[in-house]
Amino acid sequence: MDYEFLRDITGVVKVRMSMGHEVVGHWFNEEVKENLALLDEVEQAAHALKGSERSWQRAGHEYTLWMDGEEVMVRANQLEFAGDEMEEGMNYYDEESLSLCGVEDFLQVVAAYRNFVQQK
């Protein structure tokens, strides 16, 4: 999972992720927006879940972050519809709407993001 952090002309941090993980970048850009307290909450949840069967989720305005002890899923909230609403043969998976990654990989991105934000 490759990533890049940039600052736009106004100094706002933007995250770009590799193909297949774009939604993780959107989550940082739309939900985190340099809110380090949210990252603290996510890290605490990840540590609490380690080795357990439990899961945790944080719904945001545009994206929901879900995780268990091994995996993180970020999905666009617009994907919340019942299966019978989908046309037969249609798959709602879209690289721009859903992404999965391991907890350890995700926490590495969180730590790198935090370091980048604090370099102002």
Curated annotation (Swiss-Prot):
Q: Which domain of life is it from?
A: Bacteria
For this chain, the family text in UniProt reads: Belongs to the UPF0231 family.
Q: Which NCBIfam families match?
A: PRK05248.1-1, PRK05248.1-3
Fetch the HAMAP family from UniProt. Answer: UPF0231
- Classification via InterPro entries: UPF0231
Q: Which organism is it from?
A: Escherichia coli O139:H28 (strain E24377A / ETEC)
Q: Which parts pass through the membrane?
A: none
Q: What is the name attached to this protein's record?
A: UPF0231 protein YacL
